């Protein structure tokens, strides 16, 4: 054991010495051999692929640029009318995100030419408002909290300053170190998106994305080789730390992206464990589309006199300015049948994401839509490799409709999404904001349509008020009962899918009848005793249940009393549980003997027998 440790230490030391020697040799070589006309101040090795004319031997000098230039960026370039920045530790810049004219040219910032060139190749020539407001204090090394609406460019806001500093650091100290920057994200999709932004903005940097669902051995080997930027989810980061593969002792920059979601999904303890392992001398930044007050306790503990850059302020509007919101009433049995007309009318051949509450709905709806459209499903039960292929196909335009659960609601930056359809009311306003934020990104236009039932009208008004956006009501689309038969089993015929009254602002958005949904003769997503998406969002129904997956018999997923596997957990509980009630098991029954009654009549076949047996 001791021999192995000593051997690895000697290997790391050899890597560092070799890297430093090569850096020194290259610097001296090019200082002596470069023509006088091209020689300026100290050369910096940054990994650019540019080849400078006049170098001898016809050798392509990878990683050479001649001067990164001073940081020629002044506060006056940001502090414009309506976009002022105060000198206090909390800077409110949220009067208007559109103020600032055409933005600030990236080529005038004095940052590394590599970054300017890389961003220009992506068509990014000017900074968005949050990037303008964040850049100078980030370059100064300030800890900060950045708040902006979804889709306003938060990633580049912290990415540009960090990348520029790492490039300059590498020019002086060489390569072969532990990561200098750590970015934490709540989901693997967001982590991959952030890592992609870093990689494309600075091709010379070594970046890695750390998340579960992929072989950990490959990530360990890449870390052993050496990286500049590590982006990952807290769970995988801690796993690699415990294995000794990830050394955070040299981290100079740490970023928490979508920090509010990080804490809400249960990563609070993991995040604090990671932050405790970081060097005290570092720059810490936190970015999020929303900033609940309770997140302040985290900033007080781990951030040093943080600056707040607030591009939202007290504004009620939580969506980007380019998004138009619509709503439409549809009965549960006909809801799936109107997706096609909505896509045809509002997406106009462009990209569309349809958000469902459950993985089964995503599968079945995508299967049904595939008869008329190019469509794929995306959810947590799909393997990571298939998810990546699906997203790549969607980005590249191989299909134009993506039916997804909330796994795609945060972090996915798919360009030119024209339409978002909420197949059902989301659990809360924040989910609505982040789903809708997949369109109208980076100043583009987009639309979002919310489908709801008649008894959910009050919930729609609450969303309107909390989001700060008035919905335009679309005329109802007539659906013949026969044409909707192919969609039976997706929802039910007995009312709203989110049962329960609006007893508090955080409850589910639904009427008091508790009808509809997935299983149970009177239920939906759970009554007061049955579970649902969580007990907080349960309603008045007593027998519904998207609850625990208890087993009454090997033949079905229904259970009369499956509360032992549910209780207070997110999908648990109640007296009915299961994907159906005690009389409607079978594989994936989405209704009961009194709801969908899809067995034998649905094109999907046999999803609702009356006696706990399969029927095909």
UniProtKB/Swiss-Prot annotation:
Coiled coil: none annotated. Its main location: mitochondrion. Belongs to the DEAD box helicase family. DDX21/DDX50 subfamily. It comes from Arabidopsis thaliana. GO terms for cellular component: cytosol; mitochondrion; nucleolus; plant-type cell wall; protein-containing complex. Residues 532-568, 578-587 have a biased composition (Low complexity). It is found in: Mitochondrion. This is DEAD-box ATP-dependent RNA helicase 53, mitochondrial. It comes from the Eukaryota. SUPFAM superfamilies: P-loop containing nucleoside triphosphate hydrolases (SSF52540). GO terms for biological process: Group II intron splicing; response to cold. The lineage of its organism: Eukaryota, Viridiplantae, Streptophyta, Embryophyta, Tracheophyta. Residues 135-309 form the Helicase ATP-binding domain. Residues 489-616 are annotated as: Disordered. Residues 492-501, 508-531 have a biased composition (Gly residues). PANTHER family: ATP-DEPENDENT RNA HELICASE RHLE-RELATED, HELICASE ATP-BINDING DOMAIN-CONTAINING PROTEIN. ATP binds at residues 148-155. The keyword Nucleotide-binding applies. It holds the Pfam family Helicase_C. A motif (Q motif) lies at residues 104-132. Its EC number is 3.6.4.13. InterPro entries: DEAD/DEAH_box_helicase_dom, DEAD_box_RNA_helicase, Helicase_ATP-bd, Helicase_C-like, P-loop_NTPase, RNA_helicase_DEAD_Q_motif. SMART domains: DEXDc (SM00487), HELICc (SM00490). The Q motif is unique to and characteristic of the DEAD box family of RNA helicases and controls ATP binding and hydrolysis. Residues 338-482 form the Helicase C-terminal domain. Keywords: ATP-binding, Helicase, Hydrolase, Mitochondrion, Nucleotide-binding, RNA-binding, Transit peptide. Gene3D superfamilies: P-loop containing nucleotide triphosphate hydrolases. It is an enzyme of class 3 (hydrolase).
